[in-house]
A protein has these predicted regions:
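Bacterial Sec-dependent signal peptides at the C-terminal "C-region" and cleavage site
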Residues: 6-29
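Residue-level hotspots at or immediately adjacent to binding/recognition sites across diverse folds
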Residues: 21-355
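Positively charged n-region of N-terminal signal peptides that target proteins for export
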Residues: 1-5
Length: 355
């Protein structure tokens, strides 16, 4: 059964339910979710993902890979910018079947932004980092024109890059509006979700690697920021918040933990209901480290988190999670029409369906 149809029915069934952020339907009424793997023809690790609709989605990753489907995943075309086989496209933001903006990560000039307006047949390099200390991790857009990219700290503060023309041109925003970073603090370019947006002007960025795992918030499209601690594991370069998801300017989820396979990740998820001012640990967290998270378009209290160790779902706004799949994925995202995808190592791409 198509996921967007089934979840529409579930959403309608909850109209008369109590309006509580932690409300979830009875367990017997919950859909059983499953991933349907699709053949991509690549072996790259796909950490960038941007579904547009039931038919159109983009994904990106290592070896300069940029994939595009226009038939709901039945076929994928590899449409990378030429001469980029050595780059890692860890994030991609697509607007439609023809237009997308991709971020390659790395130190110095490896951090670049490319834009296509013809479905990947041609690309324009619109930004190349010339600061050797900068390392860009993630990219996010508020709308078709306004977007941000974030770099690990330079001179003690996270660096923010901004565009006002859909990624055609970029400028570094003044550092004065950004709080000071902690020693060792950085972002994780693991899922394209260390920087996210909601509500037209709000942005959040996630950090780790320091004594506290933190989330920064901007209400003015990246010009000024505040910061809050989270209960997600910290205190080591391998620990922190890896992925964020906000369904509106108030309700958000954070996932992470310790990415090393031999380490435990208790409290791997947290939830906020005040826009990131405060964060609370999930009462029943995911079963391990998770790098990606997304709200399901409907019902509003449902979300999915993924990582190398499996996938989890919450039906109560992030308070409790339960595992529904043991396969490895790095990131997960949904289109507005309800179609959801996950991607990861060895070219893995899957569509979320009812079992």
């Amino acid at each position: 059964m198509m996921l967007h149809i089934a979840l529409s029915v579930l959403s309608a069934a909850t109209v008369l339910a109590p309006r509580s952020p932690s409300f979830a339907p009875p367990a017997d009424d919950l859909p059983q979710l499953a991933w349907e793997l699709k053949e991509t023809g690549v072996t790259a690790r796909l950490r960038g993902l941007s579904p547009v609709s039931r038919h159109v989605a983009w994904a990106s990753g290592s070896e300069g890979t940029v994939l595009r489907t226009t038939d709901g995943g039945r076929s994928w075309q590899n449409v990378p910018p030429p001469g980029t086989a050595a780059l890692q496209f860890r994030d991609i933001e697509a607007f439609d079947a023809r237009t997308a903006v991709a971020l390659s990560i790395g130190e110095g000039t490896d951090s670049r932004v490319y834009r296509t307006e013809d479905g990947g047949r041609t690309w324009a390099e619109t930004f190349r980092n010339d600061e050797p200390r900068a390392f860009y991790d993630c990219l996010a857009f508020f709308d078709h024109r306004h977007g941000l990219a974030m770099s690990d700290p330079v001179d003690g503060r996270f660096r923010i890059l901004a565009t006002e023309d859909g990624g055609r041109t970029w400028r570094v925003l003044p550092a004065e509006g950004m709080p000071e970073a902690l020693p060792g603090e950085a972002g994780f370019a693991a899922s394209g979700q260390c920087l996210v947006t909601a509500g037209g002007r709000h942005a959040w960025l996630a950090s780790g690697g320091a004594g506290r795992a933190r989330v920064f918030h901007s209400a003015d499209r990246g010009r000024t920021w505040t910061v809050a601690d989270t209960p997600v594991p910290a205190g080591d370069p391998a620990r922190g918040v890896f992925g964020l998801a906000f369904r509106d300017p108030l309700h958000g989820l954070a996932v992470g933990g310790d990415y090393r396979p031999d380490q435990q990740s208790p409290s791997a998820a947290a939830v906020t209901r005040d826009g990131g001012i405060t964060w609370r640990p999930a009462a029943t967290p995911p079963s391990g480290y998770r790098s990606g998270v997304t709200w399901l378009p409907f019902p509003s209290f449902a979300a999915v988190a993924v990582g190398p160790g499996g996938s989890d779902v919450t039906w109560d706004g992030g308070r409790t999670w339960r595992t529904f799949n043991g396969g490895s994925f790095d990131t997960v995202a949904c289109a507005r029409d309800g179609s959801c995808w996950a991607s990861g190592e060895q070219g893995r791409l899957a569509r979320l369906r009812l079992e």
